[in-house]
Amino acid sequence: MATAQLYCVCRQPYDVSRFMIECDICKDWFHGSCVEVEEHYAVDIDVYHCPNCDVHHGPSLMKKRRNWHRHDYTEPDDGSKPVQAGTSVFVRELQARTFPSGDEILQPMHGGQVTQRYLERHGFRYPIIVSKREELGLRLPPPDFSIKDVERYVGGNKVIDVIDVARQADSKMKLKAFVKYYYSPQRPKVLNVISLEFSDTKMAELVVVPDIAQKMSWVENYWPDDSYFPKPFVQKYCLMGVKDSYTDFHIDFGGTSVWYHVLWGEKIFYLIKPTPANLALYEEWSSSPNQSEVFFGEKVDKCYKCVVRQGTTLLIPTGWIHAVLTSQDCMAFGGNFLHNLNIGMQLRCYEMERRLKTPDLFKFPYFEAICWYVAKNLLETLKESREENCLPPEYLIKGVKALITALRNWLKREVTEPASEVPDHIRPNHLIKMLTKEIQYLENGNCGNKPMKLQESSICPSTRSAHERGSHARKTARRLRGHHHHHHRHHHHHHHHHHHNHQHSDGPKAPSHLDIYEQHTQEVLKRLEMGPYEEDASFNLKVNGKFNKVSTASAAAAERSLENDLRLVLCNGQIVR
């Protein structure tokens, strides 16, 4: 059996996951970490001499800089080529440009005003700026928290993505190497860290995300704990940028909304409204071969400049196109979240990413899977609204329609591109059919003779998140449906229990065990007559009496406990508990 070829001073086999560099003399390959050559630094080497060869041949030869305005600084500066984004000339020119003030579009608010109820009523269409974070529910390290502190909490050996700003190129390095770079008296280049997600580190305990991002987040509300797909972690980022760092115009992945808080330093945001015209221009610009040579802010009617100073929090809604300049060394925290308020725009952004062939690394993880989970939950929400004679808010009806269209298209696409993100317990065609029925019911005005109540998040179910439902008092017996434990493949699983308002004054008394048993039996018989109804989270019995796997957080919504806390678990028609 042939043995693997060994490389480097460490004499290890080739490892695709580690950066390596070839010696131009002996032609052996070396791990950058073994010979102290960082990946971002290797591009500056013209002729590399390994530690063995530089004894006889002298040190490696470096490339010679010939310009300050191109990503490739070795190109001759003959004045024929335009300035490229991120270069030192570009940053200087950007700082000299004039822009309409962000005050024209920013909504200054107190943290306590930024609530789910407020955004449901007024929409989340414009960026919100909050100067005092306390009432937002945002908890962060103190303002003297340093880059070294990040290393202490995250670990110096964590491999992070770093952007070489002047080249707008991504590379990997260990956090301890970035810390060394940051504190070096003369930094050889501008490096920017914008994608250090630290949910899986000790630093996660120091940060509590804003209430609004937690309460409205699809992942927090709808992602089931037993999902086959790994849970997306996009809520806790630490951004470490040195002066003159620049990130070119982009829309956050999957059309996520984003919160940013500048702990110290300063960032300047260049914000563009996601109008249909601007989105079309953005897509055209993103796919053009000379994208880096065109400043997108000049292509649109208005690009607003917004300075975010120390201690300030910025909330950017779905689809806003933005670039960011770090005007002084800066540490910021941020996070991304999908929500129910702008479902259509989120889907438009995702479809644009697909058309632009955005690499998976830069997309929202398992975006389609979460849309299926959300659809399953919103079906329950629409049913509850109908049964409680509530009219769901307009944004939700529009959102569900957009979701139905997207889900249909994804199913069609699966025929030619089988890369399914449909969770295995969801019957996709049935789910789409039931959602469509609920929307038709609303649009045809089949609401009986009673006038429908316009929905308020405090009264009706559809705008209450899993968290809010969990905190509500228990619901009356009328809503009792299928109060069995959901059996999962591996174990009983309790997601957020969803409770509902119980009017103590004039509501019906809590039912007796016999009442519950009788009602439960009637439900079961009724369902069995109608045939299996898998998408109904309140039922989940197959005809053979066995439990379906139910795996959405709000499927567990059906598990509403009453004052008497009786649980009925059916197994082959027998009550076993």
Curated annotation (Swiss-Prot):
Substrate binds at residues 247, 267. SUPFAM superfamilies: Clavaminate synthase-like, FYVE/PHD zinc finger. Binds 1 Fe(2+) ion per subunit. Fe cation binds at residues 250, 252, 322. Predominantly expressed in brain. Disulfide bonds: none annotated. Its main location: nucleus. One of its GO terms (cellular component) is nucleus. A zinc finger (PHD-type) spans 5-56. One of its GO terms (biological process) is regulation of transcription by RNA polymerase II. Keywords: Chromatin regulator, Dioxygenase, Iron, Metal-binding, Neurogenesis, Nucleus, Oxidoreductase, Transcription, Transcription regulation, Zinc, Zinc-finger. Residues 472-502 have a biased composition (Basic residues). Residues 198-354 form the JmjC domain. This is Lysine-specific demethylase 7B. It comes from Danio rerio (Zebrafish). The lineage of its organism: Eukaryota, Metazoa, Chordata, Craniata, Vertebrata. The gene is jhdm1db.
